[in-house]
Amino acid sequence: MRRNRLGFDALALRPRVLVDVSKVDASTTFLGQKLRIPVMMAPIGSLQTITPEGGVAVAKAAAEFGTINFVSSVTQPSLEEIAASTNHPKIF
């Protein structure tokens, strides 16, 4: 524990004051796909209980935002319908 604590204490956050942040790029890649930010839509089962469009709504939102949608095997409509709703990458 002591070594862990000493190692953690050795880290320091060094704020960079007066640095131009007018053009920040938080994009990254995941499995070869470019993401706008390093945030992805987690698979959620039974989305149709929240919105009638279910997985289609999430797939469209993920595509519009520029991220990846992980699709649950228990959501509706079918995986094929969700895949057809957008040509943006999806992960099952």
Residue ranges and their predicted role:
Residues 43-49:
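Glycine-rich phosphate/pyrophosphate-binding beta-alpha loops
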Residues 50-55, 71-87:
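Active-site-adjacent beta->alpha loops and helix N-cap segments on the catalytic face
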Residues 1-35:
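An N-cap/entry alpha-helix motif that binds or orients negatively charged groups
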Residues 32, 89-90:
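Short alpha-helix boundary/capping motifs
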Residues 5, 9, 59-63, 83-84:
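Surface-exposed amphipathic alpha-helices with a cationic face
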